[in-house]
Amino acid sequence: MAIVGLGTDIVEIERITAHVARSGDKLAKRVLTEAEFDIYQQHSQPSRYLAKRFAAKEAAAKALGTGIGRGVSFQHIHIGNTPDGAPTIDFTQGAQQRLALLNGVVGHISIADEKSYAIATVILESR
């Protein structure tokens, strides 16, 4: 296997908190898949959850080489968790098509947060 994509993103959590205070769930509905949005609504720290998902999806889009847009939307990238809590990443639609163009077969993701920031790194591997 070879690395075919690498992306990292960092988000200031307070920016997300301020956006949610101003616009309600508008950003969350744009960024999160339906399943992620359900978790967001029940989360004890929804802005922190949203910031981590935002960073993860931006990192994934960078790893794909497109950024958000150009055929890849936030909705095409789903961030989940294993039963042990480790983050997982799944691609659909435009993101899956772009991954296939790179001969990618799997994405690895790491997400971290500390007080003011959320950060994510995505590595894409080929066959």
UniProtKB/Swiss-Prot annotation:
Its cofactor is Mg(2+). Keywords: Cytoplasm, Fatty acid biosynthesis, Fatty acid metabolism, Lipid biosynthesis, Lipid metabolism, Magnesium, Metal-binding, Transferase. It comes from Shewanella sp. (strain MR-4). Its EC number is 2.7.8.7. One of its GO terms (cellular component) is cytoplasm. This is Holo-[acyl-carrier-protein] synthase. Gene3D superfamilies: 4'-phosphopantetheinyl transferase domain. It comes from the Bacteria. It holds the Pfam family ACPS. The lineage of its organism: Bacteria, Pseudomonadati, Pseudomonadota, Gammaproteobacteria, Alteromonadales. Transfers the 4'-phosphopantetheine moiety from coenzyme A to a Ser of acyl-carrier-protein. Belongs to the P-Pant transferase superfamily. AcpS family. The keyword Lipid metabolism applies.
